[in-house]
Amino acid sequence: MSGSRARAFRAFAPVYFSVFLFVAGSSAVSVLVPVYLSRQAHLGLAAIGAVVGVYGIASLAARIPVGLLYSAGRGRGLLVGGGLLSALAFGLVPLVHGTLALTVLMALNGLGWSIATTAQLALLVARPPLGASTAVAMGWFSGATGLGNAVAGIVGGSLADAAGLRVTFFVLAATPLVGAIAMWRSIGAAPAGAPMPPRVGRRLAVVRMPLAVWVGVLVMFFINCLNSITNTFQPVLALGAGLSLTQIGVLSSIRSWASSSSRFGSGPLFARFDPAGFTMPLVVAGTLATCFIPSVIGSFVAQIPLFVIAGLSRGLLRVTGTADAFDAVGQNDRQHGLTSAFLYGGLDVGKIVGPVAGGVVAGAFGIATMLRVLPFAFLLLYLALAVPARRAARPVAGMS
């Protein structure tokens, strides 16, 4: 039994350590960049939202080309190349102060993140450790993602308070490159005799994507809209209310701990209950938790339960949306790449819409008002698109 556990650990650890490092570095940077833009670059709220939003724009722009380019044989090279670009962007941030230069670095980071993570997720589904099922692989993947977010907030905020933003950015620059190398070594090259998927036109490949993939994209979009406005503007509002960077980082980490723990435990939960029944309550819970943040912004303790609820909502929604999408496409190598691209694309659109819309509304009415109103707007948009899509999917599922 111990030998079996050791074998499982050797198979799972490097792969999910890679996922952990990528997310930990990116999440820590996302917490610190708005503060850096405000304190060092002296940008206004609308400008901060626009610069941060460039990251999502660049990431989104690369998704579909990377998804179409992806194959099992190219995946490892894409992973390492993307990690190198993100590492370069992280390390250069504290060396520049101009708005244009910082915007370019956000774009470079978004490009690297897009290339690396699209390949990473597709490789994981194509060759999961020990042949694990998609649900198990996605549960561990989402759990490692949440764990990376959890550690990032504490480490990033504490290190920035102790050593300064400049040193912290240099340290974080190592995370995407080390993560890429860890997975590159553990996955290994594609088998020489592996069959190639049939080649179809790009437009046809997109049209043939199952409806479950598009529903998953909507889920990803919604959770990242809420997450991005919180990450971008809650630190600025909390600093003005008297919280320290360490406290802000701890709150971010609490949300991520709740998210990661729910993801690791999602397998047994969804084996007994229908995941679809949890979707609407989780969407509403995440919306309300975000809306109540400004009402208790001056209290570190009072914000803890709100961040816990937001983390639980995000974590469980991330697992269900991803697993359903990949189960729908089966073992098609091309569709693995495209599904990964589309799901991450939903997250990327959320990263764009959240900071930009948040910056515009906050610039006009203040951050507190924005955090109370904008989550409901995202909820209404999600309902308008997701409910008809799920209704259309039921007859298709019944015919299969």
State the predicted function of each range:
Residues 56-64, 149-150, 256-260, 264, ...:
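Residue-level signature of mid-helix packing/kink "hotspots" within the transmembrane helices
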Residues 115-129, 316-331:
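Intracellular juxtamembrane helix-capping segments at the cytosolic ends
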Residues 1-9, 188-216, 400:
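Juxtamembrane intracellular "pre-TM" segments in multi-pass secondary transporters
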Residues 174-194, 384-389:
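C-terminal membrane-cytosol helix-exit motif in multi-pass small-molecule transporters
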Residues 9-52, 56, 214-216, 224-237, ...:
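Helix-loop boundary and gating motifs at the non-cytosolic
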Residues 77-91, 173, 277-292:
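Structural signature of the two symmetry-related core transmembrane helices
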Residues 109-144:
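Cytoplasmic helix-loop-helix junction between adjacent transmembrane helices
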Residues 62-74, 160, 262-274:
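Helix-to-loop junctions at the C-terminal end of transmembrane segments
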